[in-house]
Structures are given as structure tokens and as C-alpha cells.
Amino acid sequence: MKSEHIPKATIKRLAMYVQVLETLKREGSQVVSSELLARTCSVNPSQIRKDLAYFGEFGVRGVGYHVQDLIYSIKHSLGVDRVWKCALVGIGNLGKALLRHQDFKFRGFDIVGAFDCDPFKIGEEISGLEVVCTRRLKDAVKELGIEIGLITTPVNRAQRATNFLIEAGVKGIINYSPAMLTVPPDVYVEYVDFFHHFYSVAFSITLDRHQDRMGGDEDD
């Protein structure tokens, strides 16, 4: 890796490249050009080359990228060429939906523990996992080798869930709640806010309509 400082936007694009490459692989493609990959991902070919350059040299001039090799190289560079064991805390509607989502394991993230503090939910079985009391999280993290925690609790319980995860030794947290979490410097948090995407789409539509109106005014 040429640089330890890699923009988060680059990491997100690399994840998108892997998703597209895996689709191409399933369709039987063995080689892909930077132009086709860029077009499919809605980015410039130069952006793809720049993103990949953080991790070394890829592809053959005039030939393109070998799909399987590039999938492996990106996954290896991102540390997702292995299985990461995860715990999910908060068994509401969103938590249950994530537990039933088959793509997690396919992508290398295996949710092996489900936790909640509600006695009415403890003992419930979802997708083969029994919901366990949050207070047992520390033992479960050690026994199951859990490294990543997913928080899907109500906002007023998110920090408490975070504290349980940190005390258990978890170093990576994906927070699906609206809460802004307080964590030590060595704990990494990613916030998943679905409304960011709604805002982005709404802005794009609004901007297009505004430009259409401006164009119509100029024609007059």
C-alpha cells in the first residue's frame, strides 16, 4: 500500500468496484476495461486508475483488468478477503431485517450474535440465531471472535449499546441509529443514515428542475 491515508470516498468506490466485478464474474467475464468498469460505476476511467494506484499497479495496457485477479487484489487490500464476525445489538424491525439479509455472509461479514435488553425479545430465534441478553455480550465477543458491532437500537439506547461493545473489546462499530456516539480514539465508527441518500436524490431532482426552468426562461 503506497499511502496509509486513503480517502473514505475511495474506499466506498472500491467496494462498488468489487460489487460490479463480482457481477461481471457471474456473467462469465474474465477481463474488463477501465472504460467499461467506469461506465458501469458512473465514474471516470482516470478515477478508477487513481483509486487502484493507492494499492499498487493493476491491469495491462491495451487489455484491461483480469476480473478475478482484481477482485482478489481489492478485497485483500481492504482486508475483506477473510470472514469478519459481527454482533448485532437491537432487535427491532431494522435489526431483524439485517439478520435476515443473506448478503452479509456473502460479502464476508458473518453476524454470529444477536443481542437485546428487552426480556420479551431474549430467547427469540431469527435466521438461526437466538437473541441473547446484552449483558452477555462480553463473553460472546470472546467466545465467538466478534470484531465488529452493528447498532440498531433506538437513539436513546445507542450509547449504552456502544459502551457494551467497547467494554467487550470490539474495535469497529456500524451505527444505524441517529445517535452521535462517544468512543475512544482506537474505536472506529461508521454512521449509516438512510436519509443522506434521500437528501442527495431530492437535491439532484431539484437542481435538474431548476436548470430546466432556467433553460426555458432563456428560450423565451
UniProtKB/Swiss-Prot annotation:
Which PANTHER family does this UniProt record tie to the protein?
A: REDOX-SENSING TRANSCRIPTIONAL REPRESSOR REX, REDOX-SENSING TRANSCRIPTIONAL REPRESSOR REX 1
* DNA-binding region coordinates: 16-55
Q: Which terms under GO biological process does the entry name?
A: negative regulation of DNA-templated transcription; response to redox state
Q: What is this protein called?
A: Redox-sensing transcriptional repressor Rex
Q: Where is the chain membrane-spanning?
A: none
Subunit and partners:
Homodimer.
Q: Which GO terms describe its cellular component?
A: cytoplasm
Instruction: Identify the HAMAP family for this entry.
Output: Rex
**Principal place of residence:** cytoplasm
Function of the protein: Modulates transcription in response to changes in cellular NADH/NAD(+) redox state.
Family to which this protein belongs? Belongs to the transcriptional regulatory Rex family.
Q: Which GO terms describe its molecular function?
A: DNA binding; DNA-binding transcription factor activity
Q: Which UniProt keywords apply?
A: Cytoplasm, DNA-binding, NAD, Repressor, Transcription, Transcription regulation
Q: Record's superkingdom?
A: Bacteria
